[in-house]
Amino acid sequence: DYVPKSVVELPSYERVKEDKRDYAIASRRELEEADAVRGKTLIQRHGKYILVQNPPMQPLDTKQLDYVYSLPYERWYRECYESLGGVPGINEVLFSITHNRGCFGACNFCSLAFHQGRAVTVRSEKSIIEEAESFLDNPRFKGYISDVGGPTANFRLPSCEKQKKLGLCKNRRCLAPTPCPNMQVSHTEYLDILRKLRNLKGIKKVFIRSGIRFDYLIEDENDEFFR
């Protein structure tokens, strides 16, 4: 059957179901096209049907992320869970702050690149500080921010300037097997945000509990983040 050049066909559902190699091929093609700039439409045959997946939308920009995190979330589980003993895991994230989205690390064992994409977008400093200040009105808050992180805590920049126009590289990874020479590396803004949060009245300590990419960290010529 004719398949347009603007479309990438994955191995059929039946082939993926029966063959590990076809499963791997389908997964790789899906990851390669998961880019809002250059990603193509994906199709996969499923019996007499054809599944169509449209190209990814543009990731939320800073203004949009700020809006999402400005909404009046309850920061607690619904009352119906009380009879089941509550939700113990809520305490791990109750007073944590997400400052970014996306990860260009693309580790083989990790699914972050699939469900958040490789393009990194961030919230503004103002939005992050306002969320921290909102904790002070919560009677459960004891002064400890458990995490200021995200998929990868120490990513505050796009991987490179080229990705804005050309998208992320299809057949290369930014950090492996060796860091790309075009990669932007800086922890200055992230460190500044952490310090401003720590200095807020009512904040005792600020922690990082999300993963830190050390291979990215050691590429930074400024070693202040280590101190």
Where do the protein language model's features map onto the residues?
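Extended, regular secondary-structure scaffolds
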Residues: 1-11, 85, 118-126, 132-138
